[in-house]
Amino acid sequence: MTQPISSALVLFSGGQDSATCLAWALDRFDRVETIGFDYGQRHAIELACRPKVRAAIRQMSPVWAEKLGEDHMIDAGVLKSLGATAMTHEVEISMTAAGLPNTFVPGRNLLFFTLAGALAVRRGIGVLVGGMCETDYSGYPDCRADTLKAQEQTLRLGLDADIRIDAPLMYLDKAATWQLAQELGGDALVALIGEETHTCYLGERGARHDWGYGCGTCPACELRSNGWQRWQDGKAAAP
């Protein structure tokens, strides 16, 4: 089955990376839809950010507003029932015996892409876009390029469809991700990401920093804030 490559389905959580990927997709495809997943995460703040980001992006550009289509919310609560992680249960963030942070939810991205692929086939969409990245901190195995290549092949075979997975942030660090947002949508998109997206593992929205809201000390906040500072330092040093 041939799927059109002029359309994309963005895995959109409401965080910095997926918001940047949404802008990236709107810059490249004729029709863009979004898909989000409620998997029983400890803090639903990201999910609450999703409609705000979509609405703000519509206001930023009439061209993007015309391209941005339907949003789909999927119940993936089965992930929480499989076992405790720091993303789904009230446990402290730590390293596991396997050498991975316990913020890793086993199988999460594999399930997300499977569900997104099934929806894309029904919607006549040929490209799935995800904000996975193997450059920064986590080392999550389901964020690696090899994993996504294998997942793409599995979807193509299992769905008999010419589906492609694009991961525009795969080899970018957080500083480069901020720069990409600037290139795609200028100061307006950078400001939108800072104000409306959410990354903090602890769900903190009370403290506003230059880079956005968060506790400032969890691994996700440190990654985002350090990336912001490196980006700012790079701009200041530029001739």
From Swiss-Prot:
Q: How is the cofactor bound?
A: Binds 1 zinc ion per subunit.
Keywords assigned: ATP-binding, Ligase, Metal-binding, Nucleotide-binding, Queuosine biosynthesis, Zinc
Q: Where does Zn(2+) bind?
A: C200, C215, C218, C221
GO terms under biological process: queuosine biosynthetic process
- A Pfam family hit: QueC
What is the superkingdom listed in this entry's lineage? Bacteria
User: What EC number is given for this enzyme?
Assistant: 6.3.4.20
Pathway membership: Purine metabolism; 7-cyano-7-deazaguanine biosynthesis
Q: Which InterPro entries match?
A: QueC, Rossmann-like_a/b/a_fold
Q: Name one GO molecular function term.
A: zinc ion binding
Disulfide-bonded cysteine pairs: these are none
Q: Which cofactor does it need?
A: Zn(2+)
Classification via CDD domains: QueC-like
Q: Which top-level enzyme class is recorded in the Swiss-Prot or TrEMBL entry?
A: ligase
Q: Which residues form a coiled coil?
A: none
Residues binding ATP, per UniProt? F12, S13, G14, G15, Q16, D17, S18, A19, T20, C21, L22
- Name the chemical reaction catalysed here: 7-carboxy-7-deazaguanine + NH4(+) + ATP = 7-cyano-7-deazaguanine + ADP + phosphate + H2O + H(+)
| NCBIfam families recorded | 7-cyano-7-deazaguanine synthase QueC
Q: Which family does it belong to?
A: Belongs to the QueC family.
Q: What job does this protein perform?
A: Catalyzes the ATP-dependent conversion of 7-carboxy-7-deazaguanine (CDG) to 7-cyano-7-deazaguanine (preQ(0)).
In Swiss-Prot or TrEMBL terms, this protein is called: 7-cyano-7-deazaguanine synthase
